[in-house]
Regions:
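Walker B catalytic acidic pair
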Residues: 305-307
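Conserved NTPase motor "head" modules and their coupling/switch loops across ABC/AAA+ ATPases, GTPases
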Residues: 1-31, 171-185, 189-301, 310-329, ...
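Post-Walker A helix-loop "phosphate-sensing" segment adjacent to the P-loop in P-loop NTPases
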Residues: 45-57, 287-295
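Nucleotide-state sensing region of NTPase/ATPase domains
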Residues: 48-131, 135-147, 199-207, 238-242
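Structural recognition of the conserved hydrophobic beta-strand(s) that form the central parallel beta-sheet
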Residues: 73, 329-335
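Long, charged N-terminal accessory/stalk domains
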Residues: 123-124, 130-177, 181
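Conserved lysine of the Walker
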Residues: 36
């Protein structure tokens, strides 16, 4: 798939931008603070319903002085189908639109797939479990049609159980039973889909991370589902009810799951350098994109923010060459044109003080 048009209004320092995109590599060049990362952020918003940057709250996303923001994308799929997606915000909630009609956020993000490597991506490896669950569930969402409904049912039951746990008055035990049964049923389904996804992801991880970090040896994926193996979640929740009452929240379930990567020559995360964490995270994102392509028949849009600052020249060249070779649409930012792109065909946009100039086309 590729974004053919990206229209942005009121996002950070971008007052108004209407960007036409084509195939292949697109580079947004400008000084720090010019607004080039916000272009990638807009594409990511359409795919994830949130920002990849810290400070992604609505009031921070808004351009200073603006009361609303909107992002519109026109997406061409491999089969020629064109989807038009939009997200707007004026108040507390996102307003989502798909092909001109009101839609759920889930419908919009299912239409647009974007993966992004950026300065904070190392948190996928070095950060908390929530970041890794987000990565995992985004991938599962795009390949398992049942996932979104199961996830919504699970979240509703979790919210209801937590509400009972925080009640100021005593709660009859039988009031917990229906919500715990729902958590167990939907949690088992989510767990099964996650495990199946990780099994499918592993060969792609071996290829991408093995190419980026061959010195670390063989890769192993570890997954903990969030409650003890061989036990029914409903039984665990019943057993843990008193403990959860004292804490005011549900401490077991798929919302507590964790997965990690270990290496033959770096069995613990602490054995990785900061640079190796970044390359491992990059490998995870490229593997996820490759799995998406193998199952959907088209590559997601790949964003590489501040490429030259995040990767050395050899890894820049390898990644850009790989993505160009498979025909992915790639959006790159930098304070100048990254060296590996100078020998490739690319659309180069100059970004200055929140304005995006029409592209110059560099041909190899």
């Amino acid at each position: 798939m590729r974004l053919e048009r990206l229209r942005i209004r009121g996002l950070r320092c971008l007052a108004e931008a209407d960007i036409e995109l084509g195939e292949g590599i697109h580079v947004f060049v400008g000084a720090n603070g010019a607004g080039k990362t916000s272009v990638l952020e807009a594409a990511f918003l359409l795919s994830h319903g949130r920002s990849f940057r810290s400070g992604g709250a609505k009031e921070v996303l808004l351009q200073r002085g603006a009361s609303s923001l909107s992002v519109f994308g026109e997406i061409r799929h491999q089969d020629g189908r064109i989807g038009r997606v939009g997200l707007g915000r004026e108040g507390a909630r996102w307003d989502a639109r798909l092909d001109g009609r009101s839609a759920s956020l889930g419908e919009v993000v299912s239409e647009c797939a974007v993966v992004c490597f950026e300065p904070g991506s190392h948190a996928l490896i070095a950060g908390g479990a929530e970041e890794r669950r987000r990565y995992l569930d985004w991938g599962v969402f795009h390949v398992e049609h049942e996932f979104l409904l199961a996830w919504r049912r699970y979240q509703r039951a979790l919210k209801q159980r937590n509400s009972l746990l925080r009640s100021n008055s005593p709660v009859a035990p039988e009031l917990f039973l229906s919500w715990e049964a729902e958590l167990s049923q939907t949690g088992e389904r989510i767990h099964f889909m996650r495990v199946r996804y990780l099994d499918q992801l592993l060969p792609h991880l071996e290829q991408t991370i093995g190419g980026l970090l061959p010195e670390l040896g063989a890769i192993e994926l570890r997954y903990r589902r969030g409650w003890p193996e061989e036990r029914d979640l409903a039984e665990v929740l019943a057993d843990q009810r008193d403990r959860d009452l004292s804490r005011g929240h549900t401490t077991q379930g798929v919302h507590r799951a964790e997965w990690s990567i270990s290496f033959e020559h770096a069995p613990m995360r602490e054995h990785l350098s900061r640079g190796q964490e970044k390359l491992t995270a990059l490998g995870c994102l490229l593997a996820q994109a490759a799995l998406f392509a193998s199952q959907k028949g088209e590559w997601p849009v790949v964003c590489l923010d501040d490429l030259a600052s995040e990767l050395d020249l050899a890894h820049q060249t390898a990644v850009v060459g790989q993505l160009a070779g498979v025909g992915a649409q790639v959006l790159v930012t930098g304070t100048e044109l990254p060296a590996p792109l100078q020998s490739l065909s690319a659309h180069v946009f100059h970004v200055e003080q929140g304005k995006v100039a029409a592209p110059a086309i560099i041909t190899s």
